[in-house]
């Protein structure tokens, strides 16, 4: 069983842009953002809004939910990295997510 290669949101959008031979300035213009902001997204310095991720997905004709998931998992991973969290903390967070799901479903 092979594992899927992990990538960041920024790496993914950079790859998609290069596969379509699009310069950053054209992608940025299409998304109505500054080129420097797109570069920050590609370098994982900043995270775009959900609305912008949907626009990016439409531009590159990819599944928006997959891109949103990738951006969200990046955000979680960076937060855990910053907090120097261990696996015990991750298990507690998983349990809390399950608890919150049950609370929200009544």
Regions found by a protein language model. Name each.
Residues 18, 29, 58:
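Alpha-helical residues within the helix-turn-helix
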């Amino acid at each position: 069983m092979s594992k899927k290669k992990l990538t960041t949101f920024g790496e993914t959008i950079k790859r998609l842009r290069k596969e379509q031979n699009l310069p950053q300035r054209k992608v940025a213009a299409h998304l109505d953002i500054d080129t420097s902001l797109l570069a920050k997204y590609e370098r994982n310095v900043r995270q775009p809004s959900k609305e912008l991720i949907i626009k990016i997905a439409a531009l590159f004709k990819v599944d928006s939910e997959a891109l949103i998931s990738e951006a969200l998992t990046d955000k979680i991973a960076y937060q855990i990295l910053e907090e120097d969290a261990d696996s015990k903390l991750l298990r507690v967070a998983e349990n809390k997510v399950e608890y919150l799901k049950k609370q929200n479903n009544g």
